Amino acid sequence: MKKKTKKLLIAGGVLLLAACICVPHICSVQIRWDGITRIQSMNIPAKLPKGAAAVKEKISPLLGGTVMGFALAGILIGVILFLKKTARAIHRKLRILAVLSSFFSMPLHELMHAWACPAGSEVHLGIVPEKLVGYAVTNAPMNLAQFTAYMAVPAVAIGILPLIGALCLRKHHRNQAQFMFIYGMFGLVQTAPDWFGLIPVLRQAPADAVVQISNGITYWFTR
């Protein structure tokens, strides 16, 4: 009982610390709720300086769609669990819970995009039912570090960190480790379009570049 109480206190302390860090910054961002809308609402125009260069992006049509991405992750995880003997120990309901938890963490995914935006940025949040996706779009200019945070924070939080947690728990807390592994795998697939948007920018834009999104296209320029 004492161990459970200690764990709950630690978890509560971590959540409180996270709230103290995240809440003040998210309040400094101007959030505009677009509601349930169409894919075109994600295309917000911005005033670009002359000479701004469009980033050449190559997005995989397979991973670019959330439904297909989740299907691919399901197949991959199924193969891994089939080959892994320890997979027999995890209850089927726990697997389903992990998948659903990842799917319903999409709003958190978009809020983390908004949190990573520079203070004072206007961020549009919405849901596109036809694609089964949400979005958090800003046309605020960002330096390369800010843009990297904007694109990568969700993948770290709901993909990489759960996988690290699974590795740490695998010996003594097998069920929790399996849950975090499945959640993290789906989290990485869910954030795959972010990586496809970030990597071309890092390859094409110089270190002192300013990055700005306009009408769904990413541009970079120097001042």
Each language-model region and where it sits:
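Positively charged n-region of N-terminal signal peptides that target proteins for export
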Residues: M1-K6
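Metalloprotease/metallohydrolase-associated module, dominated by Zn2+-dependent proteases
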Residues: K7, A11, I21-I80, P129-R223
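Final/C-terminal transmembrane alpha-helix of multipass membrane proteins
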Residues: L16-C20
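Membrane-interface helix-boundary motifs at transmembrane edges
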Residues: K85-K93, R170-R174
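Membrane-helix interface/capping segments
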Residues: T86-I90, A114-V128
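Short pre-active-site segment immediately N-terminal to the catalytic Zn-binding motif
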Residues: I90-P107
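Active-site recognition of the HExxH zinc-binding catalytic motif
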Residues: S105-P118, P154
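Active-site-flanking alpha-helical
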Residues: M112-G120, L161, V201
